[in-house]
């Protein structure tokens, strides 16, 4: 009887953990789908910072004045 209770408790515990992990993953996916414009803004910021960093090198190559 004791081993049966132990087994059932273990199954309940593992099931609870797996359900909570699935719920967290689902919430993360929903969050990613809810805010695509924020992600686009982050990509634009990264692109602009890279473009501004490359600008002096570009002028150096074009005008040959470093």
From Swiss-Prot:
Residues 23-44 form a propeptide. GO terms for biological process: defense response to Gram-negative bacterium; defense response to Gram-positive bacterium; killing of cells of another organism. Disulfide bonds join 60-66. GO terms for cellular component: extracellular region. Belongs to the frog skin active peptide (FSAP) family. Brevinin subfamily. Residues 1-22 form the signal peptide. Antimicrobial peptide. Has low activity against the Gram-positive bacterium S.aureus and the Gram-negative bacterium E.coli (MIC<15 uM). Has a strong hemolytic activity. It holds the Pfam family FSAP_sig_propep. The lineage of its organism: Eukaryota, Metazoa, Chordata, Craniata, Vertebrata. It comes from Rana dybowskii (Dybovsky's frog). Keywords: Amphibian defense peptide, Antibiotic, Antimicrobial, Cleavage on pair of basic residues, Cytolysis, Disulfide bond, Hemolysis, Secreted, Signal. Its main location: secreted. It comes from the Eukaryota. Expressed by the skin glands. This is Brevinin-1DYb. It is found in: Secreted.
């Amino acid at each position: 009887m004791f081993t049966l209770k132990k087994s059932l408790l273990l199954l309940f515990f593992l099931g609870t953990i797996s359900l909570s992990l699935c719920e967290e993953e689902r919430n993360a996916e929903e969050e990613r789908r809810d805010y695509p414009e924020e992600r686009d803004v982050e990509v634009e910021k990264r692109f602009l910072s890279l473009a501004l960093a490359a600008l002096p090198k570009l002028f150096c190559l074009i005008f040959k004045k470093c």
